[in-house]
Amino acid sequence: MDKDKYPMIKIAKQKGINKMDMFDNVLLGVSESVANLQLPDPYLRNLYRDEEDRVYWLDGPISEENLDLVKMIMRCNREDKRIREEDRKPIKVFIDSPGGDVTVEWSIINAIKCSKTKIITINYCTAFSAAADILASGHERLALPGTHVMMHNGSCSYGGQSDAVESQKKYFDGLNKKITDHILSVTKLNPRVYKKKAITDWFFDENDALESGIIDQVVTDFDDLY
């Protein structure tokens, strides 16, 4: 193929641009004005797409950064205020997380409970500890085949003077009880079994999670997600 037949290559020669460099960086048949545009950053491109589709990726340890999910839920409910609940576009939360900050977890769970816009939680790899509680809190709960769930009572570390440690322990014991009561109310888990099993790490595969009411469906076709 004679590359010099292409106008862009002739322009490149006139400007002293190496032809091979030109071919490494542009597509043939694309106008010069378009070719000179910088391609969008893949991360930002996907971020914009997810924002438009109301998709949130709960990846990695749960921390204050994930309060963005609470903000997203609030924003979507504001946008949907004049739309009937059944006509609202749902929010989809894809989960792969080892768990994390219990206070952030509780904020997310309560945002889900307050949301009139439907929130679908989807386990696509692991939902451990706090992430398992968030998974179970969705208005609709899904999981891909081969995924994993782990529940336990959580762990805390306290520091400071004895009075401060006692105050912290009392507060977080109360918070853990609230979370436990909530999880038992949205799943089929037996309270006695939960109390016994959750002392240590209690693991579920996708079928166990379905049977226990942690999820509503195991997804076998991606058409069910989109």
Language model regions located:
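N-terminal organellar transit peptides
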Residues: 1-130, 137-226
